Amino acid sequence: MKCSGPSVVPRARSYVVVGACVLVLLTGQGCRESSKPAAGITITLIHQLWSDKGSQQRMNETLKTFTARSGIRVEVLPAPEPAVEQLATWRSLLAGRASVPDVYGIDVIWPEILADEFVDLRTYIPEREIAAHFPELIASYSVKGKLVALPYTMAVGALFYRVDLLRQYGYREPPKNWEELEAMAARIQKGERARGHADFWGYVWPGAPSEALTCNALEWQASESGGTVIENGTVTVDNPHSVRAWERAARWLGSISPPGVVAYKEWDSLNLWQAGQAAFMRSWSFGYVIVRAAGSPTRDRLQVAPLPEGRRGVAATFAATGYGVSRHSRHPREAAMLVGFLSSRDEQRRNCLITGMPPTIPDLYSDPEVVAEYPYLSTHLQVYRKSLISRPSTATGKLYPAVSRAYFEAVHSVLTRKTSAAQAAAALQRNLMQITALKAPASATGAP
């Protein structure tokens, strides 16, 4: 389903472009850098956050500041947009021992997969600077004591809602639980369609078979006490709580959510929301800044709340981006200087004030200017401290991409009515046990 309204989707970059850029650097300027003094060195960086025009312009200014202070130039390589393609590109470059890029953007679920290919940043970054970040993020970016990357920005799953519509339909606050969400979404949707908004929906979210669906479905099932797939060294996904959560989500399709949501990526749901065609949306907390862009119909009509709670309570996955230095870099010290600069308190504060992207340094959440400019960050911090759940990337290590794919494909089969939730959970349990060589809990196998 194609979304209407203003598009905010960044252009995706292809493998070919990335490869061509790397080839030019390896055969030209990149090969000559080793003979230059530190002040003349060029560091190359690859990161998905910088692939759209607006971000490129902002970050170019950041890099100019870094160059002015250090004398080190920085070149940014384009990257593919989807996370799965990014990881494949990163792994291909690293497997070829390419000396560029020097610095890579690292998703919080990748450290276990890529750890062997990156330097330990503790060798180059002072401990006081590392300790300034949320300790949970530092732990997530560490593998056996090795700091693979330093965090730069983060996000948590959150519920976006149209405050004007809630007031119009007599609601004083956002839904506390999934049942309230369903009732409120249905009522507002019915009312808006009666007013002539035929394409209006109650609740939109990314349902395409992708990492975004893994995050969504984990939040559904964990909030209902269904766990996070791999727990205590066992595969736990086949349980009645997960089944119930998936069944509920499947009922949303065609009811309060568009049938086409099963093909929505994150930007699709953001586009629909930004066009004013939905009452509620699940997105990352940083989506607040995107949907408040100049000219957006929802600019002054939205608020952000924690996701609805289930029987267990609220459950929100988190995302984070950090920077790591390739062990194949010819200039690891200078590359680490760039990482330290980008992840520093001053730079994160500046970036947050300009873009609204949540920082990874706790004390910035009490900065008066930051709080005044982006009040949604208080919700972000509340969710982070009370309701956070992790994807099973640490528990599964290098197998995580296969685990996540198996998971989101199983959930997607339920959403598209290809199989029942109970059948999908049972088949997924067997599949994950085969992929990971882990067992089911003793109680699930009939053992005493």
Across the structure, where does each feature detected by a protein language model lie?
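Short, well-ordered beta-strand elements
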Residues: 39-52, 72-77, 102-103, 148
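Extracytoplasmic "Venus flytrap"
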Residues: 43-61, 81, 395-398
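Extracytoplasmic "Venus flytrap"/periplasmic binding protein-like
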Residues: 65-136, 140-142, 167-176, 272, ...
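Hinge/lid segment of periplasmic solute-binding proteins
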Residues: 107-158, 198-199, 213-214, 299-305, ...
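Short, solvent-exposed loop/beta-turn-alpha elements that line the ligand-binding surface or hinge
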Residues: 122-133, 193, 201-202, 206-210, ...
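Long, aromatic- and glycine/proline-rich binding clefts that accommodate carbohydrate-like moieties
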Residues: 140-141, 300-305, 353-406, 413, ...
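Extracytoplasmic/periplasmic solute-binding protein
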Residues: 148-152, 157, 182-234, 278
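Glycine-centered hinge/linker elements that transmit conformational signals in sensory
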Residues: 184-186, 232-263, 307
